[in-house]
Structures are given as C-alpha cells and as structure tokens.
From Swiss-Prot:
Topology versus the membrane: Lipid-anchor
Lipidation (N-palmitoyl cysteine): C23
Protein location: Cell membrane
Keywords, sorted A to Z: Cell membrane, Lipoprotein, Membrane, Palmitate, Signal
Entry-linked Pfam families: DUF576
One GO location term (cellular component): plasma membrane
Name of the featured protein: Uncharacterized lipoprotein SA0405
Length: 270
C-alpha cells in the first residue's frame, strides 16, 4: 500500500512538472507571436504609408498631378494648393571608389500649374576629390520634357528629352501582397525600413532592365525607406529603391520618390 502511494505521489509530481513546463513554453510561444504581430503591424503600416502615392502609379500623364492633392499638415499656408516633387535616378559603381548617378527631379506647382526641374549627372569619389556635378534645366509642357539648357552631347540630349520617371511606367498596386519583409525601425529619428526580394519576372524589374544598362542577372531587392511620421508629413523623407547590387561594396540601383509639400519654398531647398 505504501509503495502504491509513493508511485501515485511520484506520478503527480511528474505531471505537475510537465504542466508547468508546458505553460512556460506556451507563454514563450505567445510572446514570440506577439512580437511577430508587432513587426507585421509596422510592416503593414509602412506599406500603407507608401500606398498613398504608389497606388497612383503608373502616372503616364504627369499633368494629372495638378488635380491631385496629397497629405496636408500645418506646414501649408491657407490657400496653398501644394507642390508635387517627382524624382528618379539610376546609380552605379563604375569602378572601386567611384559612384555615378543620373536622373531627373521635377517640381509640379499646383497653384500655377507649371512644372520645372533639372536633369542631373553626378560622379562621387571616395578619396579626397570633389564630386563632379552638372544640372540641366528642364520644364514640362503637355506632358513633354523640354530641355532649356544647351547640351552638346547628342546622346545626353536624347536621354534628357526622352526621360521617363519610374512612376510613369511602374505598377506597384500588388505591394499589399508582399509579406515577410526584413523590417528595421529607429523610433528615435523616427525612421522605418522594409526590404523585399523581387523576382526577375516582375514587370517593374523587366521595365527597368529594358531602360537601363543593368549587367547582372541577380534578382533585385525592393527597399522602402521613410524618415518621419508614418501617417504622413510634408517635411519627412520617403523613397523607394530597387537594388540590383551584386555585393556589398558595389552599387547598382534605381531610386524613386514622389512627395507632396508646400509650394512656397526657397529655391535653395529644391
């Protein structure tokens, strides 16, 4: 009888240990799930923040932006209809210690319904050498880029006059279906980043390969970066990058942004 009692006591203690251990594991799983949900929540918020502008892509006729309003905050003066800034550049490492990028920025003033900007060609050097910079003024009329400066190089002139922003041919409406991105958050700035692996079968990737010299078959990475409030801000920085770089020290990417800001800004800020 005493032996049976000892066996029963032993079994009770064993079951209690298993139960406590199970509860501990359950709590750990719940904690992991909560952290995952928190990350997913930020990931969704980043995508939704970008979707406010990316859902407009492709904007084949940029003059449509004159009739579209973005996020307004206290930086806007009463009566200011705001200004859209659209930007695209292609950056690549020609050789170690050297980076060149070429592209265009255009400011579309909704008050005056005019669009002015410039095409830029830049080369940056890692060593003690000042960068080479050249800007060529442009304007847009009837959805056509008009070169205002004299350009001797016929190939460069053609690139400027035929330039298309990424937002004019990109289609990122499927962004909401992207998942399991690599999320990085700095609450102190605040800044938010998320990365997604893209496929070479993606139509956006095919478009970029047809327009730029991309000498690699490597599938690119889609990088989304926000400085400022996720809900929206006229003073924050928001850009999208499609990175084809083969290794860490090389650079081969297309950068795109579309921002909405007060129209009355100093020329130096442009």
């Amino acid at each position: 009888m005493e032996y049976i009692k000892k066996i029963a006591l032993y079994m009770s203690v064993l079951l209690l240990i298993i139960f406590i251990g199970g509860c501990g594991n359950m709590k750990e799983e719940q904690k992991k799930e909560a952290n995952t949900n928190k990350t997913d929540s930020k990931e969704e918020k980043i995508k939704k923040s970008f979707a406010k502008t990316l859902d407009m892509y492709p904007i084949k006729n940029l003059e449509e932006l004159y009739d579209k309003e973005g996020y307004r905050d206290g930086e806007f003066e009463k009566g200011d209809k705001g200004m859209w800034t659209i930007y695209t550049d292609f950056a690549k490492s020609n050789k170690p210690g050297e980076l060149s990028n070429e592209g265009m920025v255009l400011y579309l003033d909704r008050n005056t319904r005019t669009a002015k900007g410039y095409y830029f060609v830049r080369t940056f050097y890692r060593k003690d050498k000042l960068p080479d910079r050249k800007n060529y003024k442009v304007e847009m009329k009837n959805n056509k880029i008009i070169l205002l400066d004299k350009v001797e190089d016929p190939n460069l002139k053609k690139r400027i006059e035929n330039f298309k922003f990424f937002g004019q041919y990109a289609n990122l409406k499927e962004l909401k279906n992207y998942s399991n991105g690599d999320v990085s958050i700095n609450e102190n700035v605040p800044s938010y980043d998320v990365k997604y692996k893209m496929s070479n079968k993606d139509e956006n990737v095919k478009q970029l390969r047809s327009r730029y010299n991309i000498p690699t078959d490597k599938s690119p990475v889609l990088k989304m970066h926000i400085d400022g409030n996720l809900k929206g801000s006229s003073v924050g920085d928001r850009k999208l990058e499609i990175d084809f770089s083969k290794r860490e020290n090389s650079h081969l990417s297309v950068i795109d942004s579309l921002d909405y800001q007060p129209a009355k800004v100093d020329e130096d800020e442009r």
